[in-house]
Amino acid sequence: MDGPLTVTQTLAGDQMVVWASTASPYPVTLSWNELGERPQPVVLTPGQPRELASRVLALGHAQTMYQIEYVWAPGAMGIREARVAHPLSDPMEMAQGPHGDFSHQGKFAYDWAVPEGTVIRAMASGWVIEVEDRFTDGGLGSAMRDQANYIHIIHTDGSIARYVHLMPGGADVSVGSFVTEGEPIGRTGNTGFSSGPHLHVEIVRLNSDIWPETIPITFFRRPTVAQDIP
């Protein structure tokens, strides 16, 4: 067992069967192989064990176990695009879009220049899987590239939203918590590789090497709820 992932081998009659399952509430992707064989990626969904392999044991032979290697990551493959709620309440012009020349080359990523401390809202419901908000500085030096504050949230389809450049202490959620679409999750800042206060968002899927890659996003505005005025 490895965290929320379990890989087991069981004897069923004359067959040795390899099973994989996840205890997490969201999809995970497992890349596994027998020693010397090519890795095979498999998406595991909650509550649905998957048979990875089986072999018939020769009569009179010992119960030969599979020799297996595997790695895994939260998320799913095959997601083509995302349609999600806008992460900011007030309409504003995008400062840099997908494949932007400044820092979005080869990426579907989206930036909005907003004052530090602007509330960030969850683009879709999901589980918080990573949080970093201890960094304090920002700038354009190469050392800044790994010093951005961020929140990562995985959705029910296995896509993962990344909210980046939060202010110091700007995360209002913690790892393991479930958030709903539109819920405040943090506050914008200017940490990491940044030329000024802004919010950077992207949504990723996993490829067959279980490496994240960004996907196109369509944003919609949440409707404003009218309130009765006495």
Which residues does each PLM region occupy?
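Asparagine-centered strand-capping/turn motif at beta-strand->loop junctions
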Residues: 17-26
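Short histidine-centered loop motifs in beta-beta connectors
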Residues: 115, 158-182
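Short, well-structured beta-strand-loop connectors
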Residues: 119-131, 172-188
